[in-house]
Every structure is written in structure tokens, then in C-alpha cells.
């Protein structure tokens, strides 16, 4: 998995979604070439390592204020969309939870905010 190179980050939100824990990080310093605004890490049960990451990272080609959402999983990664909305914590979190629910087939589960 080509996971984000997080050096330091501040947890901004934490959710429970079924058997999964979702943590949204902000103020990210990384050791890769990406400029992250937010990262959602998805952990299943007691597994110490996230199995899925969703990132909002600055799109250098599209100009100021546009962020790409990148999905990173064990079998690869892909940019799945771009939006200026994802500079906002709540907009990013809502969209990331929707995507995680869809990928993991958790449509019947309600996210429970823990932080």
C-alpha cells in the first residue's frame, strides 16, 4: 500500500461506523510530495494499521483552492474527484464517510461521532 507519508498530524474528528474506526487528520506534515489538507484513516476492529485512506490534497495543476480526493487501499490508489469544497473539514468528512460506507457496503450503518 502506498500510504500517506504522515510525519505529524492533529486528529480533528473521530467516528465509529459499524466495526470500523474513522479518524480525520488535519495540519499534516508529510515526507512525500503531496500537500495534504485532510486525511481520513479507516481502521477495522483492533487492527493497528489503517486499511483505507481518503485524502484531500492540493491540486497543483488546477490552481488555488482545488483539492483532489485520493482513495488509497491495499491494492492501489486513485484520484476519485476534485472540488474546492474539500478545503472545508465538514464537507471533506461528509463525502469521505459516504465513500467509505459505499466501499465497505455499510449503507445501513450510521456514523457515530466520538470526537
Where are these regions (language model features)?
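Generic hydrophobic, helix-prone segments enriched in Leu/Val/Ile
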Residues: 9, 53-54, 96
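Intrinsically disordered, low-complexity regions enriched in small/polar residues
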Residues: 17, 22, 38-40, 55, ...
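Generic alpha-helix signal with a bias toward terminal, lower-confidence helices
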Residues: 27, 34, 54, 92, ...
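Negatively charged, low-complexity tracts enriched in Asp/Glu with abundant Ser/Thr
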Residues: 1-46
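A short, structured beta-strand/loop element
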Residues: 34-78
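Intrinsically disordered, low-complexity regions
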Residues: 6, 19, 27, 46, ...
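Mixed-charge, Lys/Arg-enriched low-complexity segments
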Residues: 59-115
Amino acid at each position: 500500500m502506498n500510504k500517506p507519508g504522515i510525519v505529524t498530524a492533529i486528529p480533528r474528528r473521530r467516528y465509529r461506523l459499524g466495526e470500523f474506526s474513522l479518524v480525520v487528520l488535519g495540519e499534516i506534515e508529510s515526507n512525500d510530495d503531496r500537500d495534504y489538507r485532510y486525511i481520513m484513516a479507516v481502521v477495522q476492529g483492533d487492527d493497528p494499521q489503517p486499511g483505507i485512506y481518503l485524502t484531500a490534497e492540493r491540486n497543483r495543476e488546477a490552481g488555488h483552492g482545488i483539492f483532489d480526493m485520493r482513495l488509497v487501499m491495499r491494492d492501489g490508489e486513485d484520484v476519485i474527484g476534485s472540488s474546492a469544497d474539500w478545503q472545508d473539514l465538514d464537507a471533506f468528512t461528509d463525502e469521505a464517510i459516504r465513500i467509505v460506507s459505499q466501499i465497505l457496503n455499510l449503507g445501513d450503518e450510521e456514523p457515530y461521532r466520538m470526537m
